Amino acid sequence: MSWQTYVDEHLMCDIDGHHLTAAAIIGHDGSVWAQSSSFPQFKPEEVAAIMKDFDEPGSLAPTGLHLGGTKYMVIQGEPGAVIRGKKGSGGITVKKTGQALIIGIYDEPLTPGQCNMIVERLGDYLLEQGM
């Protein structure tokens, strides 16, 4: 299965008639493995800051999580494994696997819990596969 298929079928999947706003699978080095057409153009330093927070949990809290020029307030995640951010009625979930970052961006009517479930389910599967 291609990485694009994981994005299209597993991350951008339909939940009660709704889906994530955008999603991507990105290497730890910031290289894009696959992304939805709506995924924002991001800067390498934004991915570097996210990676730093996985190594040093809490490092993003003072500045917020930035992706594609959008600033998200960092909320409770799982240190070293999952970072969650909120902005208005939407937000972001980032799950770290051995080689990649699984990123989901959502807005209402999708809920934070639905975004977490979608992103973390794929992330857990990839971890089980040694990815």
Swiss-Prot record:
It is found in: Cytoplasm, Cytoskeleton. Coiled coil: none annotated. The keyword Amino-acid biosynthesis does not apply. It comes from the Eukaryota. GO terms for cellular component: cell cortex; cytoskeleton. CDD domains: PROF. The keyword Chaperone does not apply. Keywords: Actin-binding, Allergen, Cytoplasm, Cytoskeleton. SMART domains: PROF. It holds the Pfam family Profilin. GO terms for molecular function: actin monomer binding. PROSITE patterns: PROFILIN. Belongs to the profilin family. Binds to actin and affects the structure of the cytoskeleton. At high concentrations, profilin prevents the polymerization of actin, whereas it enhances it at low concentrations. By binding to PIP2, it inhibits the formation of IP3 and DG. Occurs in many kinds of cells as a complex with monomeric actin in a 1:1 ratio. This is Profilin-3. It comes from Hevea brasiliensis. The lineage of its organism: Eukaryota, Viridiplantae, Streptophyta, Embryophyta, Tracheophyta.
